[in-house]
Amino acid sequence: MKVGIIGLGIMGYRIAKNLAKDDILNYVYDRTPAKAMEFKKEFENVEYFNDPTELAKSSDVVITILSDDNAVTSIIKPLIPIASNKIIIDMSTISPITSYELAKEINSKGYFYDAPIIGTSIAVENKSIVILVGGPYEKFETVKEILTHTSNNIVYMGGNGFGLKGKLVNNLLIGVYMAALSEAFNFGLDLGLTKEQIGYILSKLSSARSPTSEIKIPKIINGDYSTQFSVKNIRKDLDIIINISQHYNSLVPLASLTENLYKITESLGYSSLDFSSIFEMYRKLTLK
């Protein structure tokens, strides 16, 4: 079975490394050729393609991990004529509606799965990410067998789009939580507490502490916003959530408010940095 990966961004590169280390990855493609060439230097047995469709022709299983709906659609649409008996696993976070429409076309010939990730780039390296899978159960065990090389927790959610629905539920909470965490931290500083005092309360003592607070509080204290999950991506996900909520007539006022806070954070130059940098938005806009 030949496996190819399309998309070598923050998450995709690390997933590809996990598969390559276990000798199950054959091909890679990225729209930035230098990334694919860099990967080839590290893993000589992996071939890189200059064209995603050519990669797909040579692969039995194609994994995509891309930035947004447009990127996924532009890659998947040309694969429809050659999808016969192929398994396509899209690990991007996009609209479930977009994913479902693509799945209908692919599933007429092959097998399409949405398989978004819960977890950071560090969790990918540790193989501790959660992968939520939506798609035909018929080939799920094959999909799971491949993904176990990069995750120890793979959950079948149901039909096409249901993996993404689960991911969006998670990201609504994560997006709002990070904003609330930053607001509380900023409030504590304004009250005269030290960063260390606030960090200890929020990450160790609070009943609202979580893996997110334990990971992100040190980043805030140290001003280290190296990207694990970017501001632009959480803002993009909240935008998807808001649009989907209208389709399902669901009330998401906190998602709407929080999306605007991340937009402000982007406008201040933090778009590509870790989404914990929303704390800097609070500091810059705090009135003294």
Question: Model-predicted segments: where are they?
Answer:
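NAD(P)+-binding Rossmann beta1-loop-alpha1 motif at the extreme N-terminus of oxidoreductases
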Residues: 1-64, 86, 121
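Amphipathic alpha-helical hairpins
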Residues: 10, 61, 67, 71, ...
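Rossmann-like NAD(P)(H) cofactor-binding subdomain of soluble oxidoreductases
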Residues: 52-57, 61-63, 68-129
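Rossmann-fold dinucleotide-binding core
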Residues: 94-171
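Helical "substrate-binding/catalytic lid" subdomain
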Residues: 162-285
